[in-house]
Amino acid sequence: MKAIDGTLRQAGGSRAAHGEPRPASALLGMLRRELLLTLRRRSEVATVLVFFVLVASLFPLAIGPEPARLRAIGPGVLWVGALLSTLLGLPRMFGEDYADGTLEQMLLSPTPFAWLVGGKIIAHWLVAGLPLVLLAPVLGLQFGLPPAALALLVGALLLGTPLLSLIGAIGAALTLGTRGGGALLALLLLPLYVPALVFGAGALAAQASGLDYSGYLSLLGAMLVVAMFLAPPVAAAAVRIAIE
């Protein structure tokens, strides 16, 4: 706990030699704190992975063993599984710090709060997004996806899962402190996740049809860049409103 408190102080109070806050140091301090906290609750990470595996594994059992059909639905199933899995950890992105008053301390720190939110978003992706990217090719084998499709799946998820975390941070901030926040969060985010789902799964569908899929990846990348600049300050503003 002392190590965690120390990294929080580092995240909130890092200063340059002339007394100016160092946002990059604060972001890294927040990232380290979030990862240390994750080590104390490994079961939550396992829950995300188990849920992803279950979603991806139940569809072949329900659809049947026909290879052509499995290859057709595989990318969409894996994308839906990744989308739903990222939702599981979003309520805790700000919820626990809101409950114990830590968010108020962060707001009082000299570091721009958006940078601290950025550290939380990166930590969420490393814990709930990156493992899904690494696991997706293994699950893709049960759908009979060829190596080229598996490689494209990984590339699309590398663009799409950070986007899901960024958009999810806004939703988590907007529902902070509300009753039934988990259900409200899902209702709020699922429509916003649709473009990422369409472009991510569409890239693999285009590849399977022999069409150019670069446009889908370009759109995913453009959405990711826009979200990287907009999501942290928007989420920070929403958290500030919820606390004040």
PLM features per residue range, with description:
Residues R42-G64, V80-A82, L192-F199, V225-A231:
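Hydrophobic alpha-helical transmembrane segments of multi-pass membrane transport/permease proteins
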Residues T47, G118-F143, L163, I167, ...:
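Hydrophobic alpha-helical transmembrane segments that constitute the membrane-spanning cores
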Residues G74-L90:
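Long, hydrophobic alpha-helical segments
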Residues K2-I4, M228-E244:
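Junction motif at the cytosolic side of a transmembrane helix
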Residues T38, L87-L107, K120-I121:
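Transmembrane helix boundary and interhelical loop/hinge segments in multi-pass membrane proteins
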Residues K2, H18-V48:
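Aromatic- and glycine-rich beta-strand/loop motifs that create alpha-glucan
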Residues A151, A156-L190, R240-E244:
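A structural motif at transmembrane helix-loop-helix junctions in multipass membrane proteins
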Residues A62-I73, P137-L158, L176, L204-L219, ...:
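Membrane-interfacial helix-loop-helix connectors in multipass membrane proteins
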